[in-house]
């Protein structure tokens, strides 16, 4: 099975953005060392516009993911900037009951049975996985399907804001830390694998 990985930026107190979902306070920590990490380890998680701005180029191959799933709130950020396919270098899926028709041929809308679609994507053959881009609502809906967490923890205390998983009621899930890396600017990237009971 392919993995569903929630690769997400988070504050040290566990929020992925302020109460409105704005995560711009994290951007000041994206320095040369961190950009090199993204470029070599997770280049596909940088949008097409971000790749152009940062000089990645379109020829940088995907390393971990070939599919991205995001909720309407996350996707709307790109639409507001006139970008209907922010991750054109991957298969793009947007979970939305309100969007209707896709504004781009590379973007498939998932109107219902989100769990069924994700399980079908995970069952596909392939070496590259599925990136759960966010936001909090879709992460909450897919919490039980997440196989791996990659937390980019920024040295910022937000106090309140958007949680990593919205709408999840006291579901205890165990994960194992599989790797961690500390950057000079205080950012810590930790990777966790879900511990599932053997069937």
PLM region descriptions:
Residues 1-199:
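Enzymes that bind and transform nitrogen-containing heteroaromatic metabolites
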